[in-house]
Amino acid sequence: TIMYRPTFNFSKGNSNSGNFSETLNNESTPINRKEATNHQTNDRFSTNGSLQLNRKLNSKGRNIALRLYYDLDDGNSDRYSLSNTYYLKYGDSIKTLNQWIEKLDKNNKYQVQITYMEPVFTNRFIEINYSYQHRSSLSEKYAYDWDKQEDTYSQYPDTAHSDCYKNKYSTHQTGIFFRTIRTNYFYNIGIE
């Protein structure tokens, strides 16, 4: 028996936002205020699925099964952020931050599981299984400052506002079980 069940998803979107904040002193006099606007576009693709193969080896219940599972998720976005911070306490001054922020996210997972079942008595079986799972994640964010001289965003990222990380890990798991199957009940005893 072979069964394969995949799913796919794709999405696109964009958003605009703005905010205003103000800091006051004890006399309720503004000491600074901040105005910010953001425009963002993003798209994401994800897919997952499972493939299962079952092989019956005899009529008494001996069989072997293989199951493969995967889950993949990729997303990226572009955000244009402009903020002006006005410092009012010691005379008027302004700090402007104009950035293009590029972000990438990847999350992957796959698992392989094999199960063998051997009949030992009537309606009683020994099951042995093994599974291997691997996960990985990647996140990259690069922020590019506006270059007034070039009248465009810098080709080099601003390290103070950029970051990236990558994680990987794997797990192995095995187990053995004694299984009893009756018309009105069943039970498992085992370790893994």
Which sequence ranges carry the predicted segments?
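Primarily recognizes Gram-negative and organellar outer-membrane beta-barrels
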Residues: 1-192
